[in-house]
A protein has these predicted regions:
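Histidine/cysteine-enriched polar flanking segments
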Residues: 1-325
Length: 325
């Protein structure tokens, strides 16, 4: 059985799905359709964050305000040995935290806004670092993100979520000496309603993050793979990032699931041209990822064009917590 935790808008009217009091429910998926689905996968999402500790034991952090107790009860029965902990602070959320524990040097990607959020409440930097190290059992913490990102990409959330533009892939068989990572890239081609000074500023900030990761921060050798960040309006409020993805990497065999941002049908002529442009860019992205050593690239059709109006995409709306054959 494969448990996928899904965050649904209220009033979706999907009768076949359980409707708990919060927006979180569990859906069983047939693993026979997914050859590589086995072992724990560390996928990050806002309300739940699952990862393996340094001893290889499964841990799950959750938001007490948004996850029903029945969800935790089901998971505790389905995944023996998993430990459950509530997020110790409202300034922490899955979208801000990406633990990578299967590396020779385990590390935690933590959004820079976490530090600034705690600092505004009077917590010194060393207290924040110590707390995160204790929570995750990881010594090395990297702090991506900036106020530029927070303003342009995170207008509906109190803290900037780095899963909007980063997706760790782990080590690939073609280049095992690197930690591969997707980083979003904004270009005039992907800014579909015209280039602007604000778009250029955001593109520069994303490029700076890519360069920073390639500089081997804390001695970690990253190999950056750039993927498109779409801007669908002139105000940079409707954004779809191909880095808001999920990756399955088992023994160096990696496949990546990306949100399909092509608009739904039926479409007027102007949206039809938009759909063609998005599809063309996504097809080229698939080739880039395959050439980088990823075995399979899957664009998932989930009406993400519409969902991205509410800052949501594949990484924010689904999570595989554990798999069994």
């Amino acid at each position: 059985m494969v448990f996928i935790e899904v965050q649904l808008p209220h009033g979706t009217g999907i009768a076949e799905l359980p409707q708990p009091s919060s927006s979180v429910c569990l859906i069983p998926v047939n693993p026979d359709d997914h050859v590589l689905m086995n072992g724990l996968t560390s996928w990050v999402q806002d309300v739940i964050l699952s990862f393996e500790d340094s001893a290889g034991k499964p841990v799950l952090l959750f938001d007490e305000k948004r996850v029903d107790a029945i969800v935790l009860e089901l998971l505790s029965r389905a995944i023996p040995g998993m430990r459950f902990f509530p997020y110790p602070s409202e300034n922490l959320a899955g979208g801000n935290l990406m633990p990578v524990t299967d590396a020779e040097q385990p590390f935690l990607l933590a959004g820079a806004d976490i530090a600034s959020g705690f600092a505004e409440r009077g917590f010194p930097d060393d207290t924040i670092v110590i707390g995160l190290r204790q929570l995750f059992g990881i010594t090395t913490i990297l702090w991506p993100g900036s106020s530029v990102f927070s303003g342009a990409l995170n207008n509906k959330q109190p803290l900037f979520h780095i899963d909007l533009y980063l997706c760790p892939l782990g080590r690939l068989a073609c280049a095992p000496e690197f930690q591969h990572i997707l980083v979003a890239e904004l270009t005039p081609e992907t800014c579909l309603q015209g280039w602007s000074a604000q778009a250029a500023q955001l593109a520069q900030a994303l490029n700076q993050t890519a360069v920073w990761l390639e500089s081997a921060p804390e001695g970690i050798a990253f190999k950056v793979i750039r993927v498109p960040l779409f801007v669908f309006d002139s105000e940079l409020r409707h954004i779809g990032s191909c880095a808001n993805a999920v990756a399955e990497n088992i023994n160096g065999c990696c496949r990546v699931f990306l949100p399909d941002y092509t608009p739904p049908n039926p479409l007027p002529a102007v949206e039809h041209n938009l759909k063609k442009a998005i599809r063309s860019i996504q097809q080229r992205t698939e080739i880039v990822l395959l050439n980088a050593g990823i075995q399979e690239v899957l664009f998932i059709d989930g009406n993400y064009f519409t969902l991205s109006e509410r800052e949501g995409a594949l990484h924010c709306h689904s999570k595989v917590i554990a798999r069994s054959a």
